[in-house]
């Protein structure tokens, strides 16, 4: 029998929950509990660090880069990561070489990923819509892409060429004219970003890549600057120039918007720069929730929980189930699979953290209530009639339906975007899409007769709000 670590049927919070020595994950019993929204938000497992705590460290970095540009960004990189590239902008020859040297199987897989993502995102394009409110009175909503976008691709525990694809594809589909990818320099590659990142950029047709990472990368994207002008060892200094970046050897043109995931320092920098540029979101650690019943395969459930825990020690893995048998079997499967997991120390820490748990509920209806309150970045539905259950989900970054739609598929080749809202923000936010990179502009076009027809109402409302000059602007048009 599965025995949860804590029973919240009457009271309690997550402050003291931890797994027992025999269980990789903590257990929470919500059976019989009153599942109000407020109570669930305080009781459900969630980790992540508070961005506010690192703002004092990040603010001087942003200020220095704003004042001194590339020199400051490169100095911070050398101090934090022990590597200082010759310049910020990567020569196009390095992109060509990275693609030529890329393992053929990886290249083929990336091409499949790109093709499938492009197919899905092409269908997200919006068309202009004109509404006619009367003779000579129209309002058109015109969709205009952001002009220049910076796409941040992290480096750390793993290399993420998939993040290049997931950020670039919707931006290109939206019609963004100028894209720059920023990724940390790597000492083992002579200060260049990881070659797989460079190869992915080249496959996507992106020719502007900056070798800069962390908070300093976000600041440099936001404020721009002047590159060092130094040559990269082994590459010609004849770097490509583009319309968005005249004299590309020198000018680092600031962007209008920054997207892409990163650590807490990257997130803090995005917060500090968002008065100057747009951002996609303040992403927290990745998370998976699985809503499963007795029909689910515990080996699959355990494997999927482990797969997201592999990202980060702060990653959240949550199973919600009305089945004690499934909870016990999944707990046993986790214990069996963990020893053979390559990144088992990282995974063990994530599964054992306060952000992860196996949650018992009374029934499937209660489970749906719980996962809607949790609002997971990734939500798997492994139940009987999974499609019907998925139709009742109102808060999730992405929903994966049935045993053959695991989150790993969405991370790479489902065609969906894997840049998704975290930390419960799926209650009010969406994942990255073509819409992220579009601005809706209302174009108002009225004739004299159309304005006259509604002028009395405008004047009345202006007087009601004590804004007489508004009404006068209407009257003067009809004075003779």
UniProtKB/Swiss-Prot annotation:
PANTHER family according to UniProt: HISTIDINE BIOSYNTHESIS TRIFUNCTIONAL PROTEIN (PTHR21256:SF2), HISTIDINOL DEHYDROGENASE HDH (PTHR21256)
Documented EC number(s): 1.1.1.23
InterPro entries: Ald_DH/histidinol_DH, Histidinol_DH_CS, Histidinol_DH_monofunct, Hstdl_DH
GO MF, any single term: histidinol dehydrogenase activity
Disulfide bonds: none
UniProt pathway: Amino-acid biosynthesis; L-histidine biosynthesis; L-histidine from 5-phospho-alpha-D-ribose 1-diphosphate: step 9/9
Record's keyword annotation contains Oxidoreductase: yes
Keyword Oxidoreductase: yes
Enzyme class: oxidoreductase
Top-level taxon: Bacteria
Role this protein plays: Catalyzes the sequential NAD-dependent oxidations of L-histidinol to L-histidinaldehyde and then to L-histidine.
Binding residues annotated for substrate, in chain numbering: 286, 308, 311, 378, 411, 465, 470
Residue numbers annotated as active site: 377 (proton acceptor), 378 (proton acceptor)
Swiss-Prot/TrEMBL keywords: Amino-acid biosynthesis, Histidine biosynthesis, Metal-binding, NAD, Oxidoreductase, Zinc
Protein name, entry field: Histidinol dehydrogenase
Cofactor note: Binds 1 zinc ion per subunit.
Catalytic reaction list: L-histidinol + 2 NAD(+) + H2O = L-histidine + 2 NADH + 3 H(+)
Organism: Mycolicibacterium paratuberculosis (strain ATCC BAA-968 / K-10)
Required co-factors: Zn(2+)
């Amino acid at each position: 029998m599965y025995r949860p670590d804590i029973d919240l049927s009457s009271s309690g919070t997550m402050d003291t929950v931890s797994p027992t020595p025999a269980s990789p994950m903590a257990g929470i019993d919500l059976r019989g509990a009153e599942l109000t929204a407020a109570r669930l938000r305080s009781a459900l497992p969630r980790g992540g660090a508070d961005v506010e705590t690192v703002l004092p460290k990040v603010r001087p970095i942003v200020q220095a880069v704003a004042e001194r540009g590339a020199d400051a960004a490169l100095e911070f990189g050398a101090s934090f990561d022990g590597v200082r590239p010759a310049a910020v902008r990567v020569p196009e020859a390095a992109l060509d070489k990275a693609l030529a040297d890329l393992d053929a199987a990886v290249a083929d897989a990336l091409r499949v990923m790109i093709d499938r993502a492009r197919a899905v995102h092409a269908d997200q394009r919006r068309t202009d819509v004109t509404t006619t409110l009367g003779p000579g009175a129209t309002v058109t909503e015109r969709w205009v892409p952001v002009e220049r976008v910076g796409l941040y691709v992290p480096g750390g525990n793993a290399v993420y060429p998939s993040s290049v694809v997931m950020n670039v594809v919707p931006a290109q589909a939206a019609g963004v004219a100028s894209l720059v990818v920023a990724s940390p320099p790597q000492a083992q590659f002579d200060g260049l970003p990881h070659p797989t990142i460079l190869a992915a950029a080249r496959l996507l047709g992106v020719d502007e890549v900056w070798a800069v990472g962390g908070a300093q990368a976000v600041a440099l994207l936001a404020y721009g600057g002047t590159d060092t002008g130094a040559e990269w060892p082994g590459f010609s200094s004849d770097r490509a120039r583009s319309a968005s970046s005249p004299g590309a050897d020198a000018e680092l043109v600031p962007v209008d918007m920054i997207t892409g995931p990163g650590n807490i320092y990257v997130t803090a920098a995005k917060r500090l720069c968002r008065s100057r540029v747009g951002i996609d979101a303040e992403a927290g650690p990745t998370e998976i929730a699985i809503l499963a019943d007795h029909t689910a395969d515990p080996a699959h459930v355990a494997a999927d929980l482990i797969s997201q825990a592999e990202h980060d020690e702060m990653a959240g893995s949550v199973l919600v189930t009305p089945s004690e048998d499934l909870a016990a079997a999944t707990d046993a499967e986790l214990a069996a699979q963990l020893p053979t997991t390559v990144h088992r120390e990282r995974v063990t820490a994530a599964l054992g953290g306060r952000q992860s748990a196996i949650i018992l509920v009374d029934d499937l209806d209660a489970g749906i209530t719980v996962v809607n309150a949790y609002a997971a970045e990734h939500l798997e539905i492994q139940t009987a009639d999974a499609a019907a259950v998925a139709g009742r989900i109102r808060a999730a970054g992405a929903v994966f339906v049935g045993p053959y739609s695991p989150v790993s598929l969405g991370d790479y080749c489902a065609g969906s975007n894997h840049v998704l809202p975290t930390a419960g923000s799926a209650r009010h936010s969406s994942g990255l899409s073509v819409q992220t990179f579009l601005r809706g502009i209302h174009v108002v076009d009225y004739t004299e007769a159309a304005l006259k027809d509604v002028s009395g109402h405008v004047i009345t409302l202006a007087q009601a709000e004590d804004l007489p000059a508004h009404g006068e602007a209407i009257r003067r048009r009809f004075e003779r």
